[in-house]
UniProtKB/Swiss-Prot annotation:
Stated role: Involved both in the piRNA and miRNA metabolic processes. As a component of the meiotic nuage, plays a central role during oogenesis by repressing transposable elements and preventing their mobilization, which is essential for the germline integrity. Repression of transposable elements is mediated via the piRNA metabolic process, which mediates the repression of transposable elements during meiosis by forming complexes composed of piRNAs and Piwi proteins and governs the repression of transposons.
Protein name (record): Protein maelstrom 1
Ranges of the DNA-binding region feature: 2-69
SUPFAM superfamilies: HMG-box
Biased composition (Polar residues): 381-391
Keywords recorded for this protein, A-Z: Cytoplasm, Developmental protein, Differentiation, DNA-binding, Meiosis, Nucleus, Oogenesis, Repressor, RNA-mediated gene silencing, Transcription, Transcription regulation
Biological processes, Gene Ontology terms: germ-line stem cell population maintenance; male meiotic nuclear division; negative regulation of DNA-templated transcription; oogenesis; piRNA processing; regulation of miRNA-mediated gene silencing; regulatory ncRNA-mediated gene silencing; spermatogenesis
Subcellular location: Cytoplasm; Nucleus
Domain of life where this protein originates: Eukaryota
Assigned protein family: Belongs to the maelstrom family.
Keyword DNA damage: no
Native organism: Drosophila persimilis
One MF annotation (Gene Ontology) recorded for this entry: transcription cis-regulatory region binding
């Protein structure tokens, strides 16, 4: 139903109510009854200003756009603007990554291009706002040819956590990194000094860039809001100018895909079957997730290396090497391209000599099936042969299935995985056609 238009009479009534002390206690209907004889006694010249005011109010009401709200009371227009800005920022980030790779490729320096991988652990997140309290930071500098050339790792003690969120911080720490909460936390307590140290380390290999160029780091899409927020948290206490170079956080998954496409192009290999879903699926498998000796001493001791940021950034570098170095014939160096201690994911068993070993080529040396029937011969099983061919013929071992025969209903296994055991006949007395238990 359309709203009623204003008229000159009601405009006069509202003004009479505002200016006449007698009308303060009257309702609208009573005020209308009082003003009706006054309005009828007024001439057209006296009514003119009120009619003009009502007309102008109607025009303004028609032209004014009413802001739409969502079910939570937020502005729909503002949400659309934020959504469009996020899409635009993501497109600009992807184009920037593609330009970096293309520039390195055209200059024949693709294998020497440095990339910095970063990761943060946090204690808790604010209920309102994108604020994370940092707990641990790690970064590594990586290139295809040199592997992991250097890394930076430190624990952080912010001194306190967000008021009222101690329980959330305890639960998050218990299920992930298991770092003690502030004020008993480990590591640096001066956030400003720590930010300057991190920024200086990230800028070591960027002397040739202009001072206003940002420092680009890479992390996973899930950690991008965490990394951005933790950098802001540290920078808030640092004495830096607004014109200082900033840190930009980019998506490592898109870098992984773009770099793989360029590596195959340089190697002269067809890359038509390579798409973002293929490379992303390989990356998230995280074949080095439980590798020993790549996390900090604390997480190594408490068996939480999976959640250690130092382990994360190194595993990303190893994944890059495992997926791309063989395409450029780059030898894998233990400790730089692959872990120092490598445990292959399969058990070698002898097979018939008729097996064709060149039937398939694994994408990763660490993604092989649990058991591979393979003839030993003189095949190299070193980590550098990550793309060696293996046979499809393998026998999976699944200890969760029941291995007995199921010839009758009595032998069908119960829900717990055990076959029902029938009692021995000696436990019963046979008499009067009934079985009576002792």
């Amino acid at each position: 139903m359309a709203p009623k238009k204003r008229n000159g009479f009601m405009t006069f009534v509202k003004e009479w109510q505002a200016n006449n002390p007698v009308a303060r206690g009257l309702s609208n209907s009573e005020a209308v009854a009082k003003c009706d004889p006054i309005w009828k006694s007024m001439g057209d010249q006296e009514r003119g200003p009120y009619n003009s005011m009502a007309k102008n109010a109607n025009v303004l009401e028609r032209t004014a756009k009413k802001e739409r709200l969502n079910c939570l009371g937020g502005s729909v227009a503002e949400m659309e603007i934020e959504k469009n800005e996020a899409i635009s920022a993501e497109l600009q980030m992807k184009r920037k990554i593609e330009r970096i790779i293309l520039t390195a490729k055209n200059s024949m320096e693709l294998e020497n291009e440095d990339f910095v991988f970063v990761s943060f652990n946090y204690f808790t997140k604010a209920l309102t706002g994108d604020i994370y309290v940092p707990a641990e930071f790690s970064a590594c500098r990586y290139s295809l040819k040199g592997g992991i050339s250097s890394n930076y790792s430190t624990m952080i003690n912010p001194g306190h956590i967000i008021y009222g969120q101690s329980r959330d911080a305890q639960d998050h720490s218990k299920t992930t990194h298991k770092l003690p909460l502030p004020p008993q936390a480990f590591g640096e307590t001066n956030m400003g000094k720590l930010y300057i140290d991190i920024f200086n380390w990230l800028s070591v290999r960027n002397e040739e860039k202009l001072d206003q160029d940002p420092v680009i780091v890479y992390t996973t899409p899930e950690l991008m809001p965490v990394v951005k927020s933790c950098f802001r948290y540290l920078a808030s206490e640092a004495e830096i100018d607004e014109d200082e170079r900033k840190i930009m956080v980019f998506d490592i998954h898109h870098l992984f895909y773009t770099l793989k496409k360029s590596v195959l192009d340089v190697a002269g290999v067809t890359n038509d079957r390579i798409n973002f879903h293929v490379t992303n699926n390989f990356f998230v498998k995280d074949f080095f997730e439980y590798t020993e000796g790549i996390s900090c001493d604390y997480h190594e001791k408490i068996d939480r290396s999976k959640y250690c940021t130092n382990s994360m950034v190194k595993r990303w570098g190893f994944t890059f090497s495992d997926y791309m170095c063989a395409d450029l014939a780059i030898p894998l160096q233990p400790g730089k391209h692959i872990p120092l201690k490598v445990k292959p994911n399969y058990t070698i068993t002898p097979a018939s000599s008729s097996t064709n070993f060149d039937e398939i080529s694994l994408d990763s040396y660490y993604s092989a099936p649990p058991r591979i029937q393979k003839e030993m011969g003189s095949r190299d099983l070193s980590p550098s042969s990550s793309h060696q061919s293996v046979s499809r013929a393998y026998v999976p071992r699944d200890h969760s299935v029941y291995g007995g025969t199921l010839d009758s209903d009595e032998e069908f296994p119960s829900l717990g995985g055990r076959r029902r055991q029938l009692p021995d006949k000696s436990h019963f007395n046979m008499g009067a056609g009934k079985k009576i238990a002792r």
